Each structure stands twice: as C-alpha cells, then as structure tokens.
C-alpha cells in the first residue's frame, strides 16, 4: 500500500502522526515541487522508540512513474521523542514528487511525527561545528521525574549536543565565527525546588535540571514536557555561548548587564519556538 500526501506529516506538529504498518511503508509527497529539495527532516513521534523509522530511502520522480534514489539511511536512532534527524541531499534535482520508503528496526508498527522538506541545505556552514563533550548524570534516579525524563530522552549525550549546535546557529552566522570554546557540558538531573540553573564558564559548563519541575511539566502531557525541556535547555545553553557586556559591571551588580544576559537567553528560546507566550509577565 502507498499513502499519498498524509496531512499529519506536513503540519509541523509531531504530536499528529502517520501510523503505518509493520513492514515497509511507502509514502508519496506530491505537492508538485518547483524548486529542488536540498534537505529534509524526519521527526520521531511521542510513541515508544520501537515505532521509530530506523531505515529509509527517499526517492524522487519527475513523472510519478519512474523513481530515483535521492537519499538512503540505515541504522538511524532518534535521541528523544519529537526529535528531528536532518538529512542533506547530495544531488538535488527538480523532482516533482518524492516517495519515502521506511520501516522500523524490528517488526513493530511504523509511526512518524513529521517529514519536512526544505529548499535550502540546512547543514551548510555548520558541518564544522565543534560539539562539546557531555557528562550526563542523574543524582536522583529514584525520583519519578528521572524516570519521566528517560521516557522523553533516550540518548542525553546526542540530545545535548544537538541543542548546543541549534543555539549556536541562532547566535552566530556560521560555525567559523568566533564563539566561546565550550568543551564540556556537565548536565545533571537533581531533586530540588526550582527549574534549572547554569554555572561555570567555558570551557566547562554546568547545568542542573529539576526532577520536580520535570514531574510538574509532564502532568499535562509528554509533549508539554518536551516543549518545556527544550525551552529551558535553549535558555541555559545561550548562557554558555553568549558574550558578556563590557564595562558595565557584572551580572549581580548591574541591572543592564543582567537584562542583557537573561534577555538574550529568553530571546533565543522564543526564536527557537519553545517559549510559551501565555506565561509572559509585563
């Protein structure tokens, strides 16, 4: 069976999913493209990782009859729920249609959150980004929040590295720009009242995230927790990569210094799409 123009795959909302079959699934995207697609993203859903696509082939066609392999991926693993895998296309062309052939690693039903195509090569200028090492630690493994976090994030190292680059992409033009040399991110899940906090300066950054806040955020849904966790992480990672104002005191002694630091972090969080505008305070 072939599915055509599945609306849930192009709405930019990974909570609305394509649910396929246990074997190879074929999905055709037929909006009659006029400009070559240069990269695409596949998103995991909120379902268990066993339902994620693990291998896929993207094909292009000029007439809907003859198909050419455009990109092929095997042994793929999503680092979290609602997570993208970005795939550049090596030899783009004026294909009018695309077909995705995908399947899971085992014999489980395939579920995909989104498939989004771009007329830009979204990897350009960032291939040489220097990813920091990650030291991930759970100080309160017995808490409900720690267990919920594990349901959301399957590979914390890759998850944190992904967000480090996303922050840099907003703050800078290319990976070759001068930026703070963040070599290691120490990320800790901790049982305390609060949300999150960053300490230290490059090359070593320390971020803690409250398991109690995780529990609270997950009360509504796993997607709400995902939204909050990414938003908080964007904010804290900006503090790792942003430059500080000069000649106006310090974070604790000058309100303009504080406003610059925190305002930039919130601005990047908003730009990334993970800022709940309904919670804004005047």
PLM feature spans:
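Aromatic, loop-rich ligand-recognition surfaces of beta-strand-rich domains
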Residues: 3-71, 81-123
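Extracellular/periplasmic catalytic domains that process cell-envelope and extracellular macromolecules
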Residues: 91-94, 128-130, 178-181, 198-203, ...
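Auxiliary, metal-adjacent structural segments of Zn-dependent hydrolase domains
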Residues: 150-209
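Zinc-dependent metallopeptidase catalytic helix centered on the HExxH motif
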Residues: 190-277
